[in-house]
């Protein structure tokens, strides 16, 4: 008897379930996507114990006919495709015919469904075996319940995380689906507690507000672009609103949420130097294209895709974001809080006052520029009173119930936008008092960000504080400028242009620089020797696994030659290519930082005025090359609000 045998259907389904049904979030994703494919306009998701105990999905879709109910739970049975040509024209979220049999094989499943023009069907399946099938009275749509997930695969249960983590995975999936299909009303409940409710009115910004908070929605920049092959729509946050994880960037392709690193990278590149290192924007991009240009049949989970015109798409995304930011003044506002916020902060301040010891009063120095008095030759330090006590800052900790264990969340402790964002709201806005009707009204009242150009307005210097911060004014209010960041931006654009124009000339090193590599690294660098010569770097083999460098391109910053060479070697080893544009940009950043004025350096009034005027001539006067803000704005209204001139 031969050793090779055909597996029975039940065992095959258990094996397939290992790829399709990894955790409760996988079940929710597959069932909700089925509901959307069935033209549902309203979907309810009910969970118990993060789905490990019970998952129930109720929709008002087309339903399943009685004769199709049994077939639907057979492997590779689907209504979405008929022949191989349909694989290249997929518009539905599901098409493989694996989800239902895979889910049924590892759970106790109950299905009640009706097409509306005939009696409904009641089906009970346990571990892939049909226990009961009967007709029943039912409204149009489908009600499917999955209980005791992985009851017959205890090994899989060992790999489940805590209830809090599994619930976080589910909410993450539901949020992505809500963003990709704003025309569908979604309700999410956990242990009978409502976590999310979207209206289904098609307004993506309202969905984003219910997920990330109304404060984030006020800082969204609309993105639109169209080419022969692609149509892009969506929203991204202003550079002042960032997170410590890429998890807040969502990419949708033909209505399907996908995880694609290169798309996220393109969004980051669209911001370029507007983002600080290690910070990422909140973004939502919906991309429509011919199904022939995207392969969604890459993985059973259908979260990964491949593009046939990837470079064209990435370039379109980058250019669209860059063009959008060029139309906006990117000056962060200090902001005035709402009445509700003021009340909350006053209570918090009282609490902190009772538990904190007041600090000794301090008298910081504020330097007035000499240009304000022609007879003065040196800056004068003038003592100015400050508030006698400040409540200590408290670090915010995210609720563990809705945060992935694998991710680190480190929100900024500084109020960087108009209304300080309480990041816990991004996970449960409805609990924070946002009823759906109130949310709709608030979203309607959001003013579109003005697209009237990004030129920095004229600024008139007032003074300098601690030799580090410049105070300036105009008819819009008060501006605080970081003098080092301002000159760093000016110098960066100067060196960037200078380095970019340099010819391929080389300069000899006084002492040859030796590079020792592993065998794998040596072979990769050896493959790129000709490319390195084209950019002016000549390597000579020295020993078995080493090279020596006798000269370098003249555009290398003085004193940083070996750092740039090491950077080039690292690029070759990792990327198997030399990105000369990136190297030159990093060299320009290095040179600009070293050449800029530092903190505690006092300037005359003429020097301050010249610095501000030169800053206005740059292409991006809002952030330094590292992404830090250059200036912050206090509007006249905000100042009047502080001093109770307006109530």
UniProtKB/Swiss-Prot annotation:
Function: This protein is involved in the repair of mismatches in DNA. It is required for dam-dependent methyl-directed DNA mismatch repair. May act as a 'molecular matchmaker', a protein that promotes the formation of a stable complex between two or more DNA-binding proteins in an ATP-dependent manner without itself being part of a final effector complex.
Pfam families hit by this protein: DNA_mis_repair, HATPase_c_3, MutL_C
Entries under PANTHER family matching the protein: DNA MISMATCH REPAIR PROTEIN MLH, PMS, MUTL, DNA MISMATCH REPAIR PROTEIN MLH1
Keyword match DNA-binding: no
Species whose genome carries this gene: Bacillus cereus (strain AH820)
Name the record gives this protein: DNA mismatch repair protein MutL
Gene Ontology biological process terms in this record: mismatch repair
CDD domains reported for this sequence: HATPase_MutL-MLH-PMS-like, MutL_Trans
Region feature Disordered, mapped onto this chain: 375-433
Coiled coil: none
Cross-referenced SUPFAM superfamilies: ATPase domain of HSP90 chaperone/DNA topoisomerase II/histidine kinase, DNA mismatch repair protein MutL, Ribosomal protein S5 domain 2-like
Underlying gene: mutL
Lineage: Bacteria, Bacillati, Bacillota, Bacilli, Bacillales
């Amino acid at each position: 008897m031969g050793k090779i045998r055909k597996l029975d259907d039940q065992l095959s389904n258990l094996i397939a379930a290992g790829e399709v049904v990894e955790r409760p979030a996988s079940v929710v994703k597959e069932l909700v996507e089925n509901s959307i494919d069935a033209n549902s306009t309203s979907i309810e998701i009910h969970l118990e114990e993060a789905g490990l105990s019970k998952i129930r999905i109720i929709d008002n879709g087309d339903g399943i006919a009685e004769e199709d109910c049994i077939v639907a739970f057979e492997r590779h049975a689907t209504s979405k495709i008929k022949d191989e040509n349909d694989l290249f024209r997929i518009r539905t979220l599901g098409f493989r015919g694996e989800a239902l049999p895979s889910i049924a094989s590892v759970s106790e499943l109950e299905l009640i469904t009706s097409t509306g023009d005939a009696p409904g069907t009641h089906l009970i399946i346990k571990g892939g075996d049909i226990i009961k099938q009967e007709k029943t009275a039912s409204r149009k749509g489908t009600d499917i319940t999955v209980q005791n997930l992985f009851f017959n695969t205890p090994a899989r249960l060992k790999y489940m995380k805590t209830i809090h983590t599994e619930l976080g995975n589910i909410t993450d999936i539901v949020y992505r689906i809500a963003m990709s299909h704003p025309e569908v009303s979604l309700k999410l409940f956990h242990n009978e507690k409502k976590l999310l409710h979207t209206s289904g009115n098609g307004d993506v910004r309202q969905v984003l507000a219910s997920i990330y908070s109304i404060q984030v929605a006020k800082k969204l920049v609309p993105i639109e672009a169209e080419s022969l092959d692609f149509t892009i729509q969506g929203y991204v946050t202003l550079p002042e609103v960032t997170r410590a994880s890429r998890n807040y960037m969502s990419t949708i392709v033909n209505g399907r949420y996908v995880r694609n690193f290169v798309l996220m990278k393109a969004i980051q590149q669209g911001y370029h130097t507007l983002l600080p290192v290690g910070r990422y924007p909140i973004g939502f991009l919906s991309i429509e294209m011919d199904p022939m240009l995207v392969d969604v049949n890459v993985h059973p989970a259908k979260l990964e895709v491949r593009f046939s015109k990837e470079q064209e798409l990435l370039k379109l995304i980058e250019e669209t974001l860059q063009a959008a930011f060029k139309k906006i003044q990117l000056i962060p506002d200090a902001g005035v809080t709402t009445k509700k916020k003021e009340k909350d902060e006053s209570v918090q301040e009282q609490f902190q006052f009772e538990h904190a010891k007041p600090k000794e009063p301090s008298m910081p120095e504020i330097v007035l520029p000499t240009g304000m008095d022609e007879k003065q030759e040196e800056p004068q330090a003038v003592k100015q009173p400050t508030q006698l006590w400040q409540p200590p800052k408290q670090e915010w900790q995210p609720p563990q119930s809705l945060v992935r264990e694998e991710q680190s969340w480190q929100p900024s402790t500084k109020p960087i936008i108009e209304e300080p964002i309480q990041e816990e709201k991004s996970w449960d806005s409805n609990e924070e008092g946002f009823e759906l009707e109130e949310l709709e009204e608030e979203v309607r009242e959001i003013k579109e960000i003005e697209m009237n150009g990004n030129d920095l307005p004229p600024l008139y210097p007032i003074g300098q504080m601690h030799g580090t911060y410049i105070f300036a004014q105009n008819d819009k209010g008060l501006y605080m400028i970081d003098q080092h960041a301002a000159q760093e931006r000016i110098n960066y654009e100067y060196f960037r242009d200078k380095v970019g124009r340099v010819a391929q000339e080389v300069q000899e090193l006084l002492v040859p620089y030796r590079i020792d590599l592993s065998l794998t690294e040596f072979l990769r660098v050896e493959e790129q020797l000709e490319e390195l010569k084209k950019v002016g770097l000549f390597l000579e083999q020295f020993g078995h696994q080493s090279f020596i460098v006798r000269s370098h391109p003249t555009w290398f910053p003085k004193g940083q030659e070996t750092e740039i060479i090491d950077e080039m070697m690292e690029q070759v080893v990792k990327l198997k290519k030399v990105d000369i544009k990136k190297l030159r940009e990093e060299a320009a950043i290095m040179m600009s930082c070293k050449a800029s004025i530092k903190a505690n350096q006092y300037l005359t009034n003429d020097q301050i005025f010249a610095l501000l005027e030169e800053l206005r001539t740059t292409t991006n006067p809002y952030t330094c090359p590292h992404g830090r803000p250059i200036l912050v704005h206090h509007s006249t209204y905000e100042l009047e609000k502080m001093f109770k001139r307006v109530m």
